[in-house]
């Protein structure tokens, strides 16, 4: 009799646990803001939208890469001594590592 009582208790607890898991698994995260009005983009109707810059930021060339020289296809150094100093520092750093 005791074994039958234990088996019924285990089955009952299993049934309750499975129902709880089934309810939890059915919860869905939705997108109510998009479904209601649609996504709000930049338009004349939405003046609070930040304006996009005309020319987006674009990083220029570093002095050490001499991009200006590369565009002109000529070896033009404004300050050759400074370039030699940079090359010496880079060579010394390479020796340290």
UniProtKB/Swiss-Prot annotation:
Signal peptide: 1-25
Entry keyword Secreted: yes
Main location group: secreted
InterPro entries in the cross-refs: RALF
Recorded GO MF terms: hormone activity
Intracellular or extracellular location(s): Secreted
Function per UniProt: Cell signaling peptide that may regulate plant stress, growth, and development. Mediates a rapid alkalinization of extracellular space by mediating a transient increase in the cytoplasmic Ca(2+) concentration leading to a calcium-dependent signaling events through a cell surface receptor and a concomitant activation of some intracellular mitogen-activated protein kinases.
Protein's UniProt name: Protein RALF-like 2
Provenance organism: Arabidopsis thaliana
Name of the encoding gene: RALFL2
């Amino acid at each position: 009799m005791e074994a039958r009582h234990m088996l019924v208790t285990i089955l009952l607890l299993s049934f309750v646990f499975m129902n709880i898991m089934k309810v939890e698994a059915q919860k869905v995260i939705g997108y109510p803001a998009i479904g209601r009005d649609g996504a709000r983009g930049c338009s004349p109707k939405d003046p609070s939208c930040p304006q996009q810059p005309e020319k987006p930021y674009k990083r220029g060339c570093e002095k050490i890469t001499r991009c200006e020289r590369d565009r002109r296809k000529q070896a033009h150094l404004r300050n050759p001594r400074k370039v030699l100093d940079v090359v010496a520092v880079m060579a010394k750093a390479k020796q340290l590592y």
